[in-house]
């Protein structure tokens, strides 16, 4: 639990380990219901997350993390995001993300032509993840 009642403790974890663990003034995430901003002393919440960036404002600075699905749990000024995968802005390889986007777009085209709904759904998720990583890296 964060000791100071005027800050949030924000942690982002994936199956590969902890990606982020800092204190901040404001956490902004995109849930299945829309964008959610959490400040210190917010009511407890559990929410399912979209493939989108998580932004953590820390004074004049802002950290951006590409979060690929998962959920958020917030209680007692502690926010924990458990994500399928997540990358800090500085850790994103833009060329790799661009290549992933191109592969996903090509797979989508082939799946549409073949009327392959399963492959299409997987490729659309891959495209959202690649675009998310590119957007976070370029901010």
From Swiss-Prot:
Span-the-membrane segments of this chain are: none
Hydrolase: is it a keyword of this entry?
Answer: no
Q: Which InterPro entries match?
A: ATP_F1_dsu/esu_C_sf, ATP_synth_F1_dsu/esu, ATP_synth_F1_dsu/esu_N, ATP_synth_F1_esu_C, ATPsynth_dsu/esu_N
Question: CDD domains, alphabetically?
Answer: F1-ATPase_delta
Its chief place of residence is membrane
* Protein localization: Cell membrane
Q: Any idea which GO molecular function terms this record carries?
A: ATP binding; proton-transporting ATP synthase activity, rotational mechanism
Which keywords does UniProt give here? ATP synthesis, Cell membrane, CF(1), Hydrogen ion transport, Ion transport, Membrane, Transport
Q: Gene3D superfamilies of this UniProt entry?
A: ATP synthase delta/epsilon subunit, C-terminal domain, F0F1 ATP synthase delta/epsilon subunit, N-terminal
Q: Transmembrane helix: is it a keyword of this entry?
A: no
- Topology in membrane: Peripheral membrane protein
> Where does it sit, as one GO cellular component term?
plasma membrane
Cross-referenced PANTHER family, in alphabetical order?
ATP SYNTHASE DELTA/EPSILON CHAIN, ATP SYNTHASE EPSILON CHAIN, CHLOROPLASTIC
What the entry lists under HAMAP family is as follows: ATP_synth_epsil_bac
> What is the recorded function of this protein according to its Swiss-Prot or TrEMBL entry?
Produces ATP from ADP in the presence of a proton gradient across the membrane.
The record describes its quaternary structure and partners as: F-type ATPases have 2 components, CF(1) - the catalytic core - and CF(0) - the membrane proton channel. CF(1) has five subunits: alpha(3), beta(3), gamma(1), delta(1), epsilon(1). CF(0) has three main subunits: a, b and c.
Q: Which family does it belong to?
A: Belongs to the ATPase epsilon chain family.
Mind telling me what this protein is named?
A: ATP synthase epsilon chain
Which organism's genome codes for this protein? Answer: Levilactobacillus brevis (strain ATCC 367 / BCRC 12310 / CIP 105137 / JCM 1170 / LMG 11437 / NCIMB 947 / NCTC 947)
């Amino acid at each position: 639990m964060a000791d100071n009642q005027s800050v949030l403790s924000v942690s982002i974890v994936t199956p590969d380990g902890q990606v982020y663990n800092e204190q901040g003034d404001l956490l902004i995430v995109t849930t299945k219901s829309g964008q959610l901003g959490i400040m210190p002393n917010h009511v407890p919440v559990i929410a399912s997350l979209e493939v989108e960036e998580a932004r953590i404002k820390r004074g004049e600075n802002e950290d951006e993390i590409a979060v690929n699905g998962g959920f958020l749990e917030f209680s007692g000024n502690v926010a924990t995001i458990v994500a399928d995968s997540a990358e800090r802005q500085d850790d994103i390889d833009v060329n790799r993300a661009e290549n992933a986007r191109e592969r996903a777009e090509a797979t989508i085209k082939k799946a549409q032509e073949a009327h392959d709904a399963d492959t299409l759904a997987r490729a659309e998720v891959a495209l959202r993840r690649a675009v998310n990583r590119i957007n976070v890296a370029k901010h």
